[in-house]
């Protein structure tokens, strides 16, 4: 449930160790593209785990590896990095930020989305435009098994437009701050590398 700027920062950091992807626009487009399900379903999240290869809320790396073994273009590698990042993001939040849970154990969505939007837009303003330009040059595949090329392209357009505008939240991030997000970007790399290494074998 990370937002686009965090996904792009994770992808960029991961690509330092996998330089064949570092300048590939399709890889960066893939790194935001599982969330193109919102073009189809809007706020209905009933299909989100499916298009996230069963990694939306919990880590299931075998399903990403199986996907990569069928599809391994740069776009698809980025797609897999996105869904793994979401699973690791949720795990980190549950372990490190119990303050974002309501008394019944569910997520306090008001606090969560305030923080994630404020922080993601701040990260974008702090040098994110270059990554967005690179992502904006990417071309989505026409034969993806889960989402259409048109859905990917519309999501790409909508994300670019949104971040070049005004953040929908106001105030100051309290828990998911830029420091928290940047630390996550670093801390998730070892596990991402390990999973990708299993695919490469």
Predicted regions and their residues:
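N-terminal leader/auxiliary helical segments
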Residues: 1-201
């Amino acid at each position: 449930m990370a937002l686009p700027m965090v996904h792009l920062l994770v992808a960029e950091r991961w690509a330092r160790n996998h330089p064949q992807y570092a300048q590939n626009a399709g890889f960066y487009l893939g790194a935001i593209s599982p969330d193109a399900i919102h073009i189809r379903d809007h706020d209905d999240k009933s299909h989100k785990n499916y298009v996230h290869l069963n990694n939306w809320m919990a880590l299931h790396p075998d399903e990403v590896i199986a996907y990569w073994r069928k599809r391994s273009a740069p776009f698809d590698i980025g797609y897999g990095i996105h869904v793994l990042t979401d699973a690791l993001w949720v795990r980190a939040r549950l372990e490190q930020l119990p303050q974002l849970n309501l008394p019944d154990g569910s997520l306090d969505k008001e606090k969560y989305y305030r923080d994630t939007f404020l922080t993601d837009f701040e990260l974008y303003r702090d040098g994110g435009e270059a990554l967005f330009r690179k992502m904006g040059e990417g071309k989505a595949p026409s034969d993806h098994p889960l989402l259409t090329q048109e859905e990917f392209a519309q999501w790409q357009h909508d994300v670019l437009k949104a971040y070049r505008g005004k953040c929908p939240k106001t105030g100051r991030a309290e828990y998911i701050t830029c420091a928290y997000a940047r630390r996550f970007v670093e801390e998730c790399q070892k596990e991402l590398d390990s999973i990708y290494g299993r695919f490469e074998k």
